[in-house]
Swiss-Prot record:
The active site is at E239 (proton acceptor). Kelch repeats lie at residues 51-95, 97-149, 151-184, 185-230, 233-282, 304-353, 355-384. Keywords: Carbohydrate metabolism, Isomerase, Kelch repeat, Periplasm, Repeat, Signal. Converts alpha-N-acetylneuranimic acid (Neu5Ac) to the beta-anomer, accelerating the equilibrium between the alpha- and beta-anomers. Probably facilitates sialidase-negative bacteria to compete successfully for limited amounts of extracellular Neu5Ac, which is likely taken up in the beta-anomer. In addition, the rapid removal of sialic acid from solution might be advantageous to the bacterium to damp down host responses. Residues 1-29 form the signal peptide. Homodimer. It holds the Pfam family NANM. Gene3D superfamilies: Kelch-type beta propeller. It catalyses: N-acetyl-alpha-neuraminate = N-acetyl-beta-neuraminate. The keyword Cell inner membrane does not apply. This is N-acetylneuraminate epimerase. The gene is nanM. It is an enzyme of class 5 (isomerase). Its main location: periplasm.
Amino acid sequence: MGMQMKNFKKMMTLMALCLSVAITTSGYATTLPDIPEPLKNGTGAIDNNGVIYVGLGTAGTSWYKIDLKKQHKDWERIKSFPGGAREQSVSVFLNDELYVFGGVGKKNSESPLQVYSDVYKYSPVKNTWQKVDTISPVGLTGHTGVKLNETMVLITGGVNEHIFDKYFIDIEAADESEKNKVIYNYFNKPAKDYFFNKIVFIYNAKENTWKNAGELPGAGTAGSSSVMENNFLMLINGELKPGLRTDVIYRAMWDNDKLTWLKNSQLPPSPGEQQQEGLAGAFSGYSHGVLLVGGGANFPGAKQNYTNGKFYSHEGINKKWRDEVYGLVNGHWQYMGKMKQPLGYGVSVSYGDEVFLIGGENAKGKPVSSVTSFTMRDGNLLIK
């Protein structure tokens, strides 16, 4: 998409889990074939029958599925997404249909990149997509979501669509001599000036309604990971502003249609590092009661720069894709070991006690088609 996409990808780059454990590769874990095409900044979900669906992002409008219950597991292409190519959407299964919320993309070849607030759903039985007659209360990009039950999904976080959209409008309108000024002015602001979304929304697919369920107990984030287990919600890290992460993990209990916030926690520093920068685009999921968080990316030193008053906190810092894995064991976060390679911005899907890491972006910023998994087994973290 020319210079506009170049700036968009730069923006996505910037935004954009003590137990004694052993890291091994294991024959116990399920082995899945690579996705038919590399995938980063995509989305995915699993249905109640053990079928995983992934698509969008660098796959364009393509979607694929794989049945985990079949003896011979292969990816199959399903009907293409009708809403246009987009990145950073969120998807969940509700009422046996795949719902896709928001994202960022171009409506046509001439339009600027923009945040979407639309919703689509896919019927596995009919192999058809349908645009849902609703729009989200705010634009949804950099948001995160978790399924609450068969009819409701919780969605929170994400960028401010007006500020985000204006950046790309300004970049497109600027000549070459002005672009660096536009970029600097956009990034050189305190976190509060980006107005990342901190409202928690509940969408009810049966009633096709949205509900305000309150606000996050701290700052809004973008690029956070989220998981739900036994009615406990975990919102993991994310960006406070472009280039600046947080190491905070929000925890809440969902009970009687009400969200009650509990005490926050923090990821520990990586071995050899003085502080935890926090992660955006990390993989996450539960295995045998242990919450595992791995991969993602950050800008080492950005947090200290921001503390020192430098608002363009990641200026001049190379983005670092992470390979560390952390685990929440008996209420305490611990460093568990390393992934096969640094990776972030892929799709996390849990099935039983396996957490599948599908696609992602490698340390060169390129999308990958690999599928790996985390599993806790007999006190060991198994990586397949």
